[in-house]
């Protein structure tokens, strides 16, 4: 099991996702992964992807009615690559799709969507700056446009846009708008739709070798004087291409120079049929421009527009206005809308539902995550900060007041939501009024995040003790495993404010499935003891902090030797585990002001006026501090229970080297364990609670390292 856990701890979270459904508006900034399978955007929602250099799709794209997919760049040197390369994937748009690289002026963008089928019933925008030539392509063996497609560039370049597959047939029953763009038609085209060229756009029909390559119902509209249409001269094609809007200087041409040949003229116009014929020797093409043109206003010119074959004298221009005898078909009257701006709420947000097929559970040094069935964007247990005020009105008669609450939560992986478990009393303030002094204490916020791959019971126990001299607030948070693969995370927080001269005591226990190391850093007098309580499911419950009667376990005592009127005690204990996810944190911050506490111990003769903590099998008659319950004598049993399930190392490091840190005693009842005869050395390690040996900090790291290696290879 340890070997399996070690292997899992080195793996990254990996999930094979088959689909994602956008149900509410979502905006993503910067680099994201779009290779996530099928994508569906529901009606009323949009997905806006901003400044993501490469957006690669691997599954079906389905944009519902009144929905939108926006991919855009706002950075001049960030080109956009939007790719779909799947022979079986389909693109279905009933809403709005906008691929917008108009601001990308320093790089070549590319839009190339190659799938099994393409169907547009809504609005589809392909936009670029045109500063650098780029290619745009919407490819599918089955290709249908019933809506609006806009191919736009800020300025004309040699780039082009292509629809469909070479040699296959596309069906256009809608409107295709070109602005500063070249549409190169390489496939057959069917349908009664319209292709509109405006603002220096060109239509290049390069497949007229097939006499049926262009439907007689398909329409090409030259919307301004800078637009043009050109066909490839590969033979004299009897097919007639419908052209609207010819006039005002725009052009119709071939890929060869116009010249007389084979008994014919370079160009001719039939006013009855409205057909304009162009020829280059044996090659030629016919265009139905409509009636009403004046033959004197035709002239041979050169179309040297970018992106199309440019030949001298290869086109015809008409200098007069467009005659009104030929009305536009309904498809050409559809408005060529401007490219929409991408929605941007200024921040990243996410509203989606993800379906996954397979998932691999993995952990790092702090968490274990698993996703199954639906997206779990975050599964977090958060300890919220709340303030609880404990007031003792009869401090002279109160031995202690404790409030204990247990909150049980479970973290599951079947729901796609953020799980937040709040444990109150993470920030606790207590006030005790006495005739001599007032002490307040606040415990720091304790935040723990636990994500497990199996069901886990999380138990939070908060214990607050109030004595006549001050408040001791102890908060212990632990997690017990519901399965052998789950990891236990425990947090212990303790806060105590004694009267002046009192020593601050911190009690912390950590249990888990792997060794824990607890490092304690103290700046003033600190002693360690263990409060009583009955562990449940691995949780350790403390009824308070003792300072008079020691437990039979190992006691680390430090006494002040100076007369101090005001004492600020701060103790912080942090437990970490490099190979697991167990975390234990004990934080004690206290400030007390008042007269010296004289702990008169009847059976000892140590009369220290500042801090006389002689806690070795004696009856302590504390005149100021009397908050110790008889149940504290059970601590040794609790220690045995805890240490039987894990190896706990308590490392004590003192900031001030002038004070002794620990007393070592082979017998708990030894009366020589007083502050005056302390032989402890800063930086000692006390294994478990026996006090039988001392190890250096370096040895602690060695043992922790060997334990880690052992866990990895077992």
Swiss-Prot record:
It holds the Pfam family Hyphal_reg_CWP. Keywords: Cell wall, Glycoprotein, GPI-anchor, Lipoprotein, Membrane, Secreted, Signal, Virulence. Disulfide bonds: none annotated. One of its GO terms (cellular component) is fungal-type cell wall. Induction: Expression is down-regulated in absence of GOA1. A lipid is attached at residue 690 (GPI-anchor amidated asparagine). Residues 346-504, 520-544, 559-590, 597-625, 665-679 have a biased composition (Low complexity). InterPro entries: Hyphal-reg_cell_wall_N. Residues 320-633, 660-692 are annotated as: Disordered. It is a lipid-anchor; GPI-anchor. Residues 320-330, 505-519, 545-558 have a biased composition (Polar residues). Its main location: secreted. GPI-anchored cell wall protein involved in cell wall organization, hyphal growth, as well as in host-fungal interaction and virulence. This is Cell wall protein IFF7. It comes from Candida albicans (strain SC5314 / ATCC MYA-2876) (Yeast).
């Amino acid at each position: 099991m340890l070997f399996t856990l070690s292997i899992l701890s080195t793996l990254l979270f990996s999930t094979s996702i088959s689909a994602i459904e956008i149900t509410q508006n979502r905006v993503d900034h910067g680099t994201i992964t779009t290779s996530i399978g099928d994508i569906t955007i529901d009606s009323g929602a949009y997905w806006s992807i901003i400044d993501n250099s490469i957006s690669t799709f691997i599954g079906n794209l389905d944009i519902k009615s009144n929905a939108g997919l926006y991919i855009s760049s706002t950075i001049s040197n960030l080109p956009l690559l939007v790719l779909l390369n799947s022979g079986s994937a389909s693109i279905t748009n009933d809403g709005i799709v906008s691929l917008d690289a108009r601001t990308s002026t320093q790089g070549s963008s590319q839009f190339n969507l190659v799938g099994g089928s393409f169907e547009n019933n809504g609005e589809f925008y392909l936009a670029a700056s045109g500063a650098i030539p780029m290619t745009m392509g919407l490819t599918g063996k089955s290709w249908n446009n019933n809506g609006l497609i806009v191919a736009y560039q800020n300025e004309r370049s040699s780039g082009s846009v292509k629809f469909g597959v070479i040699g296959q047939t596309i069906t256009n029953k809608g409107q295709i708008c070109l602005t500063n763009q070249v549409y190169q038609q390489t496939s057959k085209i069917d349908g009664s739709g319209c292709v509109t060229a405006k603002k220096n756009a060109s239509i290049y029909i390069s497949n007229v070798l097939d006499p049926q390559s262009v439907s007689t119902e398909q329409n090409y509209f030259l919307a301004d004087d800078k637009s043009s249409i050109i066909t490839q001269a590969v033979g004299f094609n009897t097919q007639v291409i419908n052209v609207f809007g010819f006039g005002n200087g725009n052009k119709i041409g071939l890929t060869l120079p116009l010249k007389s040949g084979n008994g014919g003229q370079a160009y001719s116009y039939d006013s009855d049929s409205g057909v304009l014929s162009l020829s280059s020797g044996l090659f030629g093409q016919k265009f139905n421009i409509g009636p009403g043109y004046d033959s004197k206003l035709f002239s041979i010119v050169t179309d040297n527009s970018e992106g199309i074959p440019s030949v001298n004298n290869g086109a015809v221009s008409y200098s007069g206005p467009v005659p009104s005898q030929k009305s536009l078909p309904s498809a050409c009257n559809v408005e060529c809308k401007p490219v929409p701006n991408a929605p941007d709420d200024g921040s990243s947000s996410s509203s989606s539902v993800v379906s996954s097929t397979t998932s691999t559970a993995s952990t790092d040094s702090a968490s274990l995550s698993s996703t199954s069935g639906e997206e779990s964007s975050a599964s977090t247990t958060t300890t919220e900060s709340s303030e609880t005020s404990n007031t003792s009105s009869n401090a002279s008669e109160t031995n202690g007041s404790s409030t204990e609450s247990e909150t049980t939560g479970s973290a599951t992986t079947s729901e796609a939501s953020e799980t937040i478990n709040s444990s109150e009393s993470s920030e606790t303030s207590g006030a005790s009024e006495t005739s001599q002094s007032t002490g307040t204490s606040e415990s720091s916020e304790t935040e723990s995040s636990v994500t497990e791959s199996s069901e886990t019971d999380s138990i939070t126990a908060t214990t607050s003790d109030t004595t006549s001299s001050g408040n001791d607030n102890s908060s212990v948070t632990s997690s017990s495993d519901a399965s052998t693969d789950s990891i236990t995370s425990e947090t212990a927080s303790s806060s105590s404010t004694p009267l002046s001269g009192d020593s601050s005591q911190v009690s912390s226990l950590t249990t888990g499935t792997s060794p824990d190391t607890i490092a304690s850093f103290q700046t003033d007098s600190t002693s360690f003891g263990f409060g009583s309580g009955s562990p449940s499911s691995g949780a350790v419950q403390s009824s308070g902090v003792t300072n008079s009667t020691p437990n039979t376990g190992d006691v680390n005592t430090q006494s002040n030797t100076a007369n101090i009127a005001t004492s600020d005690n701060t103790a912080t204990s942090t437990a970490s585990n490099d190979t697991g996810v167990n975390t234990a944190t004990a934080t004690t911050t206290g400030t007390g002001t008042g007269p010296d506490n004289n702990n008169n111990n009847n059976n000892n003769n140590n009369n220290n006026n500042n801090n006389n903590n002689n806690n070795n099998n004696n009856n302590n008659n504390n005149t100021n501090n009397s908050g110790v319950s008889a149940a504290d004598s059970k601590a040794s049993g609790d220690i045995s229970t805890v240490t039987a399930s894990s190896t706990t190392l308590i490392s004590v490091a003192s900031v001030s080297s002038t004070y002794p840190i620990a007393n070592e005693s082979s017998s708990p009842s030894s009366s020589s364990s007083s502050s005056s005869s302390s032989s402890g050395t800063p930086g000692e390690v006390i294994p478990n609670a026996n006090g039988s040996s001392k190890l250096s900090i370096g040895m602690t790291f060695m043992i922790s390292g060997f334990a880690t290696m052992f866990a990895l290879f077992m």
